[in-house]
Amino acid sequence: MCRLRVLLLLLPLAFVSSSALPIHDVDSQQNTSGFLGLQRLLQSFSRLFLKNDLLRDLDNFFSSPMDFRDLPRNFHQEENQEHRMGNHTLSSHLQIDKVTDNQTGEVLISEKVEASIEPERNPEGDWKVPKVEAKEPPVPVQKVTDSLHPEPRQVAFWIMKMPRRRTQPDVQDGGRWLIEKRHRMQAIRDGLRGGAREDSLEDGVHIPQHAKLPVRKTHFLYILRPSQQL
């Protein structure tokens, strides 16, 4: 109620000052334009607050004073309120903080109040939120082509010959295969057979089958490039 009384005391002073102020010329009117704007602002406040229904709810809007000595050393509180005042909605946000320094014992107390007045909204008027129609996602349009005449495309690939890997070292001195026992046994058997077939091998040189090197195959690498539309 203290704030309301201060506001009511300012209203008569504004009316008296505006009526007692003479207006002589254009210069004086320009100098008093700011004061006239303040007078109109006070008049709009008087029309809003000097109503019986607003006066009844005005005391309930302002919270009762709080004794900060009873609060703990560190305190934080936020409170939101809404009050219907005639055709208007009065919203308030109250925030109280108390912080105590443990080293120096300093106490910092802050109280913050934010208030706003909103007029009654007409759901069928300008405040109506437009409805957002759900649209179907666009479907990608495929290029129409004749099935009998497909589009020509260019296909290319590269052929690379892979290097051969040597699986076994080359035979040196013609007798590396005699290292293992089975090779030696095979040589003895081949020697015995060679004496019995000496006549049949006069025209050629006998080469043991196990001494022949394996046949090496050639490998190729094919790299296909993606097709390109001509």
Curated annotation (Swiss-Prot):
Q: What is this protein called?
A: Dickkopf-like protein 1
Q: Organism, per UniProt?
A: Mus musculus (Mouse)
Signal sequence coordinates: 1-20
Query: Per the record, what phenotype accompanies loss of this gene's function?
Result: Nullizygous embryos Dkkl1 mice develop into viable, fertile adults.
Annotated compartments: Secreted; Cytoplasmic vesicle, Secretory vesicle, Acrosome
**The keyword Signal belongs to this UniProt entry's keyword annotation:** yes
Tissue and organ expression note: Testis-specific. Abundant in the seminiferous tubules where it is associated with developing spermatocytes. Expressed only in testis (at protein level). Not detectable on postnatal days 4 and 9 but after day 18 it gradually increased as the development of testes progressed. Expressed at high levels in testis and at weak levels in epididymis.
Q: GO CC annotation: what is one?
A: acrosomal vesicle
Cell membrane: is it a keyword of this entry?
no
Q: How does it assemble?
A: Interacts with SLXL1; Co-localize in seminiferous tubules. Interacts with SLY.
Q: So which residues have sugars stuck on them?
A: 31, 87, 102
Q: What does this protein do?
A: Involved in fertilization by facilitating sperm penetration of the zona pellucida. May promote spermatocyte apoptosis, thereby limiting sperm production. In adults, may reduce testosterone synthesis in Leydig cells. Is not essential either for development or fertility.
Kindly state which keywords UniProt assigns to this record, in alphabetical order.
Answer: Cytoplasmic vesicle, Glycoprotein, Secreted, Signal
Q: Classify the source by domain of life.
A: Eukaryota
Query: What's the domain remark here?
Result: Contains a N-terminal domain similar to that of the N-terminal section of DKK3.
From its record, what is one biological process in GO terms? penetration of zona pellucida
Q: How is it modified after translation?
A: N-glycosylated during spermatogenesis. Not N-glycosylated in mature sperm.
